[in-house]
Amino acid sequence: MNGRIAVAIALGGALGALARFYISGILPVYKDFPVGTLLVNSIASFILGYIYGLLFWGIDVPADWRAFFGTGFCGALSTFSTFSYETFSLLREREYFLAALNISANVIITVSLVFIGFILARR
């Protein structure tokens, strides 16, 4: 890894972490459901799908921009550990329906958004 890539990852990571902090702070929970985490994971999934769609469809995305958005911004914006903790907390509180909804929503929505981003990159 060269220095330019490292700086791109660091800058993207800083912006992604700040975005996650503010988005999750605005929408932390809605009636015990962790909306903020679902939203940040969804945004990051769409962006990653779009970037890798561009690459797949033959559009050159410079390595430093891939590092900035992919590893840096999206890596810091999305959060599997918080999703896991929030799901565990719902289970601990015996909110079984909300825990199942959280798991289902995160998997279905984020995978769908990767697909949508991938397809939109073709246009």
Curated annotation (Swiss-Prot):
Its main location: membrane. Keywords: Cell membrane, Ion channel, Ion transport, Membrane, Metal-binding, Sodium, Transmembrane, Transmembrane helix, Transport. GO terms for biological process: cellular detoxification of fluoride. It catalyses: fluoride(in) = fluoride(out). Pfam families: CRCB. GO terms for molecular function: fluoride channel activity; metal ion binding. The chain crosses the membrane at residues 7-27, 39-59, 68-88, 100-120. It is found in: Cell membrane. Na(+) binds at G75, S78. It is a multi-pass membrane protein. Fluoride-specific ion channel. Important for reducing fluoride concentration in the cell, thus reducing its toxicity. Belongs to the fluoride channel Fluc/FEX (TC 1.A.43) family. This is Fluoride-specific ion channel FluC. It comes from Thermococcus onnurineus (strain NA1).
